[in-house]
Amino acid sequence: MIEKDKISQILDLLEEAYPEAECALHHQNVFQLIVAVALSAQTTDKSVNQVTPALFAQYPTPQALAEADPEDVAAYIKRIGMYKTKSKNIVAMAQKLCSDFGGEVPDDYDALISLPGVGRKTANVVLSVGFGQPRIAVDTHVFRVANRIGLVHEKDVLKTELALMEEIPEERWSRTHHSLIFHGRQCCDARKPKCDVCPIHTYCEYVNGPETQG
């Protein structure tokens, strides 16, 4: 595993390389955010952004979505993966928001994961982006990049999240989440990483091996 002082240098370089790194899902409030994140599972943010404008125009509030027929909702999101399941989930989510939380998205982790269709990653994104809480949400990009370059060495998403929280200062958690996502999308591709133009290649275990990195 990379030493902590080098981890700090890696994070600095990633922040310099991706100063624009932020949540790529278009939203105007926390309700729209949680719906968009729930829809983004196994789907690109770009695809979600193509369907949410019409969806949010038709169902602008939790109350409106809670009263919707899932089949009608599905028609708005059929261009994304698992749209039938997701339409049922976001309607059920809205119903629970209205019945249990006064129509407001809660800012508590346990409350969030009690909502249909909301897992650990979605809850962490909402808490970080929507409420400004320090969180590291581990998606496929964060998992791949963090383990590939040697920030952590873990086999699953939860262990990766906990290990990153241990290695990275809390005040950098949210920023690191976005930087790793942008690096995974733009440079550290799953199949063909662009190591020749990578801003952190001198530190990367994938490039240099665990004994020679840095």
Where are these regions (language model features)?
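Catalytic cores of DNA base-excision repair glycosylases
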Residues: 2-213
